[in-house]
Structure formats: C-alpha cells, structure tokens
Amino acid sequence: ILVNEGFTVPVWHENGTIGKKKTRKELHVFSPGTNFNVHEKKEETNTIACYVVTKHDKGFMKKNPSIYFGCAAIDIFTGNTKLFQYSITSSNIHNHNVFDELERFNSIYNPSETIIIHNYDEEKKIDDIIQFAGLQTKSIHVISELIDSDQSRMVEKCEQQAYQKSILTDFYNDINDYDSFIESSNLSRNPIAYKSFCFLLDFIFQHNPNLTHKLNHPTFDNINNRLVLANHSLRQLNIVNPHNVKGQFSSIERMINKCVTPMGRRNFRDIILHPVNDIPYLKRQYKIVDYVVSNYEKFEFMRKKFKTIRDFEHLYRKIIFNKIS
C-alpha cells in the first residue's frame, strides 16, 4: 500500500531468537519503480527512469545557451532498457517546446518512479520542467549536481570512464570487449544518456541487487526515420493515457490494442508509440495487414492458441529471482 502511494519502504530481516543476540540486516528497499510483486501483477510493465538535464550558458564562443538531455528507462518486469539523448541550442531554453522530446520519451515508457538530475540553481525551474514534460509519476527524486550530497557525488562518479566501464561490465557479464560494445551500442557517442544509465543501474542495485540481473542490452530511441512528435502530440491526440485512467477506452492505444498475449500488447504499444516515416517499411506493413485481414480465417486458430500463452518475459525475470512457482 505504501509503495503504491509513492513511498520508499526499506525491509529489514531479523536474525536470532529470544535469549540470543539479534542482528538486523537490510533485505531490500521497495519503491514504486523497483517493486517486483510476483503475487499481484496488475500492470504489464513497471518502469523506472532517470533524466539528466544539463544546461550550458552562452559564452564568448556561444551566442545562445544550450540544454542537454540524457534519458534512461528500465522495465524491471521485462528487463528492457531504453536510452535517449538530445540537445537544443536556443535563445530561450526554458519553454515547453524545448522539452517536447523529454515529454515524448516519458509518455512512451510511463515510469512509475523518476529521478531528475540537474545543474540548475533555481528550484522553481525544476518545477517548471516537471510540468513541461508532464512528469506525473508516483515518486520523483530531484538531485542537484550543485549541492554536495551522497547522490550528487554518485552522479559525478557516473561521469568517470573508469567507473562507467566497471559498472557496465559488472551488470553485463556477457560483454567480452568493452570498447567494441560501447561503440556498437552508441553509448560512446551519447555520454549524457550513458551517465544517466549508469546512475539508474546503481540506484536499482541499491534497492534490490536481483533487479539488475540479466537485463537486456540498452537500445537507443534515437532513430533517424522516426516521425518527430511535437507539442505533446501523444497526449493531445489521446494516443496515450495522459492521466493514467483505467479502461479500454482510456486511450487510442488501449482501444485498438487487441493483442491476446502480454508480449504482443507490449510490442504493439512500442510500434504505435514510435511512428516512422520510412515509406518502404510502411508499405510492407500495410501489405501484411491487408493480407491478414483478407485471409483472417486462416489465422483465427492461431489467435485462439495464443490466448493460452503466458507472459514469457515476466516468467523469465521470475526465474532469475528464484520466485517461479
């Protein structure tokens, strides 16, 4: 109940019996984005996100100020990991249009817990950013890089190449060649997103080390053929549910998502929320849809079979945690 209301709840385990010296050890820390409840799975995803927002003022060589965004999101139910980085240079970097891409990323992955790391010296501007980007999560942690704290020191650590290598190779033991991996995964070309990713991995590990086991390799949302969505398009067109309202007709995505397996519903949502402008690809998809609709009787038996398939991605995570039953 406390976690669902946005609280962070540490759980301590007590050893020893009456008459003997008792010891207590922190078992796990539960929070909205790190709560893996195997007994009560109401949603098909549970995502925690970290957003690094860094501004650079104008100077002798720069006529206008810039703002950089590094985004990382991890779904603890499936182990999927998504990253995104972008920057904007403008005379006015504090208006809602500047945060359109952050709002898009947040709307797509809809985290239940969010970490905001920033270098602003005005707290009011962070409140504005939360409003601009529509961050309506159960729990929001705000970390200033300008204020000395354990968390800000960890943020600084996540910028160091040696620490980045250490944390990545610790959590992904299938990486044989680190340099090749960060090149092929685009981490080396997106340092702000990499920094955000490292901090998020450590944050989750501190809550529950099991949640960082067997995560999928990070993939970037920076796709060249992706349709640009501005002015909060996904929310304004009601493609996604802007207020987390329940029900089939709470958004267009939920209304048209008729997939019968959890994996299918997640994949369908991912496709709908990542529209592309690649014409050959779209034509191929239209042909496939047209063929299936025209020959639906050939596929109807498959749909009935699919209804018996359980959530394999979630089951795999349960196996990792030794909670399968």
Question: Which residues fall in each region the model found?
Answer:
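Conserved interaction-surface patches within small, structured recognition/assembly domains
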Residues: 296-299
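Charged catalytic and DNA/RNA-contacting regions of genome-maintenance
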Residues: 1-291, 304-307, 311-317
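C-terminal helical "lid" subdomain and adjoining coupling/linker elements of P-loop NTPases
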Residues: 320-325
